Amino acid sequence: MALADMEIDGEMKKVLLQAPKNGFFYVIDRQDGKVLRAHPFAAVTWATHVDLETGRPVENPAVDYTDNGAWVLPGPLGAHNWQAMSIDLEAGLAYIPTQENPFFYAIQEDYKKTGVFKWTPGQWNMGCLLYTSDAADE
């Protein structure tokens, strides 16, 4: 996250720059909280874009994993995590440590049958099955 003064659409704005785990880089007006820009900075399949009116990502129906499962980017580790990013306003660049780790999400078979999620000791219990890209090779 970074604070900056930038020219946006011909007007100087005080902005917050943020690259969260969801894969979109946000430019947010610090005065009113409005999302001014939002573009992917890494591979993103779970959403098609960010609605600038609401500030919310628009989910991609093609990656609905309810019936058959789906590969999703970024995975639960995120496109960017706690590592610091850096901004060079003169060059117009943001330097962001990113990662692209796809995960395959699928609904647990037990849940499909019973409506109850199965808790498994020693695993991420997120209410769905998760597989890394390494698992696809096995």
Regions found by a protein language model. Name each.
Residues 1-20, 81-86, 93-98:
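Repeat-blade elements of multi-bladed beta-propeller folds
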Residues 9, 47-78, 113-130:
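Surface-exposed acidic, glycine/proline-enriched linker/cap segments
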Residues 23-24, 101:
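Loop/turn residues immediately N-terminal
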